[in-house]
A protein has these predicted regions:
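Negatively charged, low-complexity tracts enriched in Asp/Glu with abundant Ser/Thr
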Residues: 1-42
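Short, exposed beta-strand "edge-strand" segments with a Pro/Gly-rich flavor and a Y/T-containing core
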Residues: 2-6, 71-77
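Intrinsically disordered, low-complexity segments enriched in proline/serine/threonine
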Residues: 10-11, 48, 93
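Mature, structured domains enriched in cysteine- and short glycine motifs
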Residues: 22, 27, 32, 57, ...
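Solvent-exposed, charged interface segments at domain starts and junctions
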Residues: 36-38, 62, 82
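Short aromatic-glycine-(Arg/Gly/Cys) micro-motifs in beta-strand/loop hairpins
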Residues: 42-71
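A short, charged, amphipathic alpha-helix used as a generic interaction element across diverse proteins
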Residues: 75-93
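Short, Lys/Arg-rich amphipathic alpha-helical interaction segments
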Residues: 93-104
Length: 104
């Protein structure tokens, strides 16, 4: 069984974690993610991470399990755009983002 942690590792799928949030009971869910994996829409997840792709620096929003396994991701123009997208999916999430202290 995978270890459950509220804090992600420094890298997820070869991308450096910049910010992360735990989606707990106090956070809403809009009912739609509009993120499809293998032809099915991804539902509510317990963790989100905003990451910088190592080679390009592109911003990715990862939808993750409790153990930080990545289920799906979306690309964004900026960290702020990724946070705005996450807030549309999970109303009330904006105050829960934590800045990761990852080394470069």
């Amino acid at each position: 069984m995978a270890k459950v942690s509220s804090k992600p590792p420094q890298l997820l799928d070869s991308a450096r974690v910049l910010h992360y949030a735990n989606v707990d009971k106090g956070v809403g869910f809009a009912g739609r993610t509009l993120l499809f994996v293998d032809g099915k829409e991804l539902g509510k997840v317990p963790n989100l991470a905003i990451c910088a792709e190592v080679s390009s620096g592109g911003v990715l929003l990862f939808h993750c399990s409790r153990a930080w396994k990545v289920f799906g991701c979306s690309a964004h123009d900026s960290v702020e755009a990724a946070k705005e997208k996450a807030e549309r999916i999970y109303p009330g999430l904006s105050s829960r983002w934590v800045e990761a202290k990852a080394s470069k």
